[in-house]
């Protein structure tokens, strides 16, 4: 089944996205939130079920176990994972191949980290990265302009071998452009 991970920078926006998805027909169990606080009811229930299922198998510490529980639930149940940047590190989501950046961070490495959650060893499909941009919003346009300039700098120093660079510049994934060559 198709899985999608959506990244945003704030918990408020995370909750807004979840509410909008529910309005379109997604059920509560289809949508999973990850923000590093592990304080909502659903996350606590998922963690308790994971503990029962994995009793005696692992003792990584609470934070790591919560991450394992979230990833396990996403892999087997939920269709959409909505993360703050707390989810841009330490999650292995190679079973998911669609990354949506709802808002763009100032730091291009954060975009790399977000995409890297899915674009990793074991991924069986091309990873599609979608960067949303509100062109009517001056702040969003400014962030995009700054990111574009930073990616141009990286291109000059490291070469244009970056998935995020291709996705950000033209909306076409880097792999797709290579296949067209």
Task: State what each model feature region is.
Residues 2-10:
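Conserved RecA-like ASCE P-loop NTPase motor core of nucleic-acid helicases/translocases
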Residues 11-13, 38-40, 87-89, 105-108, ...:
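Conserved nucleotide-binding/hydrolysis micro-motifs of P-loop NTPases
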Residues 15-20, 43-45, 94-95, 112, ...:
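A short acidic (Asp/Glu
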Residues 26, 117-127, 156:
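Arginine/glycine-rich "motif VI" loop of SF2 helicases in the C-terminal RecA-like domain
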Residues 28-84:
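Conserved helicase ATPase core of P-loop NTP-dependent helicases/translocases
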Residues 68-71, 82-96, 115-123:
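SF2 helicase motor core recognition
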Residues 91-104, 128-131:
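A short beta-strand element within the Helicase C-terminal
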Residues 125-181:
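C-terminal accessory region of SF2 helicases/translocases
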């Amino acid at each position: 089944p198709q899985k999608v991970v959506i990244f945003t920078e704030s918990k408020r926006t995370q909750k807004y996205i979840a509410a909008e998805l529910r309005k379109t027909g997604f059920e509560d169990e289809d949508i999973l939130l990850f923000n590093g606080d592990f304080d909502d009811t659903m996350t606590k229930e998922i963690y308790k079920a994971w503990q029962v299922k994995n009793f005696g198998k692992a003792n990584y510490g609470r934070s790591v176990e919560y991450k394992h529980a979230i990833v396990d639930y996403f892999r087997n149940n939920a269709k959409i994972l909505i993360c703050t940047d707390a989810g841009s590190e330490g999650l292995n989501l190679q079973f998911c191949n669609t990354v949506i950046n709802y808002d763009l961070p100032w730091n291009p490495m954060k975009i790399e980290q977000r995409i890297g959650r899915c674009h990793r060893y074991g991924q069986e499909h091309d990873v599609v990265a979608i960067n949303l941009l509100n062109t009517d919003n001056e702040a969003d346009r400014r962030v995009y302009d700054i990111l574009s300039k930073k990616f141009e700098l990286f291109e000059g120093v490291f070469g244009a071998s970056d998935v995020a660079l291709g996705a950000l510049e033209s909306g076409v994934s880097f792999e797709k452009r290579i296949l067209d060559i």
